[in-house]
UniProtKB/Swiss-Prot annotation:
Assembly and interaction partners: Homodimer.
GO cellular component annotations of the record: cytosol
Keywords: Cytoplasm, Gluconeogenesis, Glycolysis, Isomerase
This enzyme's EC code(s): 5.3.1.1
Xref: SUPFAM superfamilies: Triosephosphate isomerase (TIM) (SSF51351)
Protein name, as recorded: Triosephosphate isomerase
Organism field: Lactobacillus johnsonii (strain CNCM I-12250 / La1 / NCC 533)
Length: 251
């Protein structure tokens, strides 16, 4: 059985003081991690206090990006090795904002996935199509190509442990949500792609999230779908009550 995973992606929000307040507000009210895994991915400047404040609670921690080199003359980057030393569990890579604003390529994302695994951090690999790709009805081939490129050279064992987040770019921060059926259809396509690349067992183990205007009002319906194992949540993860409503969707 795949354990559901709800991960908040704070993007460029929250300072260390706000992070401490947020974690203190949620940490006693999170579900048992065997029922639902609760994750907050925060800006690098907040990670130390996020981890420290979350200690002893059911809150898992994530970074929003990392580089594929562990150290050296790479001004402004985040080391996957240091994330591991800090005890950070997850790292989001390949988010559409990173691909769009910062021109990250599929090759960069593949290198990052390998670097994270080499340093004991679990990647959350994002994929998803733009509005024009969907309107041209090319979303399947687009996302399949992203998955193939991102997973290139990873072992079946690695892939069964990572998380894939499907985030249709047209539904991020636009208030438009893919219908639960549209989301399920793409998450199923992703699972079938993993099966084609590896095997059925790997495809059954990999957790696939939907990301794109996930909120308390639609989380139950999305999570009822067989191939959706979680949510990668933006705005709705910034408020403690809203985040708690998401992770406790089973109640």
């Amino acid at each position: 059985m795949r354990t559901p995973i709800i991960a908040g992606n704070w993007k460029l929000h929250m300072n260390p003081e706000q992070t401490i307040e947020f974690v203190n507000a949620v940490k006693g009210k999170l579900p048992d991690p065997s029922k639902v895994e609760s994750v907050i991915a925060a800006p690098a400047v907040d990670l130390y206090v996020l981890k420290k404040t979350a200690e002893g609670s059911n809150l898992h921690t994530g970074a929003e990006n990392a580089y594929f080199e562990v150290e050296g003359a790479f001004t402004g980057e985040t080391s996957p090795k240091v994330l591991n030393e800090m005890g950070i569990d997850y790292c989001i890579i390949g988010h559409s904002e990173r691909r769009g604003y910062f021109h990250e390529t599929d090759e960069d994302i593949n290198k990052k996935a390998k670097a994270l695994f080499a340093n004991g951090v679990t990647p959350i690999i994002c994929c998803g199509e733009s509005l024009e790709t969907r309107e041209a009805n090319k979303q399947d081939e687009w996302v399949v190509a992203q998955i193939k490129a991102a997973l290139d050279g990873l072992t079946a064992e690695q892939v069964s442990k990572l998380v894939i987040a499907y985030e249709p770019i047209w539904a991020i921060g636009t208030g438009k949500t893919a219908s639960a059926d549209q989301a399920e259809e793409m998450c199923k396509t992703i699972r079938e792609t993993v099966k084609d690349l590896y095997n059925e067992e790997t495809a059954e183990n990999v957790r696939i999230q939907y990301g794109g205007s996930v909120k308390p009002a639609n989380v139950k319906e999305l999570m009822s779908k067989p191939d959706i194992d979680g949510g990668l949540v933006g705005g709705a993860s910034l408020d403690p009550e809203s985040f708690l409503a998401l992770v406790n969707y089973q109640d």
